[in-house]
């Protein structure tokens, strides 16, 4: 929170540079934000892995049947089987998750897709999320997890989905 108060919103937009000639560069993809020099835009190297694929696998955790948001670390994050970080041109498809806290986090990545995902078992904290990334596609995610309702913890909902 301090960063946003003292520095302001931080925007990162990941791009591939095609040709470079002197002080002129060309991006392979369109720019997603207006570039205004008063905001101090800068170009940085971006160390990353490319063309990483995760497919045709099932991850099984041990999320409990009485999930409570922010109860403790076990409820919010004990069963996060995979995180896609600093990846480009990468994908996840035909993957199943059972009783997990969070299926997948896509962070600091570009041109990543996650699709044809199934989430079952006990409810957890999150399904699939993207944070600080550019051009991420998340689609065809079926979440049928079971767990207590947010506003009535005494009622267990079949197929409630992640929190």
Model-derived regions: residue spans:
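Extracellular/periplasmic carbohydrate-active domains that bind, remodel
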Residues: 1-163
């Amino acid at each position: 929170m301090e960063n946003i108060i003292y520095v302001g919103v931080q925007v990162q937009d990941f791009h591939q540079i095609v040709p470079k000639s002197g002080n002129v560069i060309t991006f392979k993809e369109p720019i997603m934000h207006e570039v205004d020099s008063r905001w101090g835009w800068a170009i940085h190297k971006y160390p990353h892995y490319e063309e990483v694929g995760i497919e045709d696998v099932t991850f099984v955790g041990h999320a409990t049947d009485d999930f409570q948001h922010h109860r403790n670390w076990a409820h919010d994050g004990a069963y996060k089987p995979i995180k896609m970080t600093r990846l480009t041109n990468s994908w996840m498809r035909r993957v199943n998750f059972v009783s997990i806290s969070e299926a997948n986090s896509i962070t600091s990545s570009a041109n990543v897709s996650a699709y044809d995902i199934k989430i079952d078992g006990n409810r957890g904290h999150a399904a699939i999320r993207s944070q600080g990334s550019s051009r991420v596609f998340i689609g065809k995610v079926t979440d049928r997890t079971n767990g207590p309702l947010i506003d009535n913890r005494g009622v267990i909902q079949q197929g409630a989905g992640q929190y």
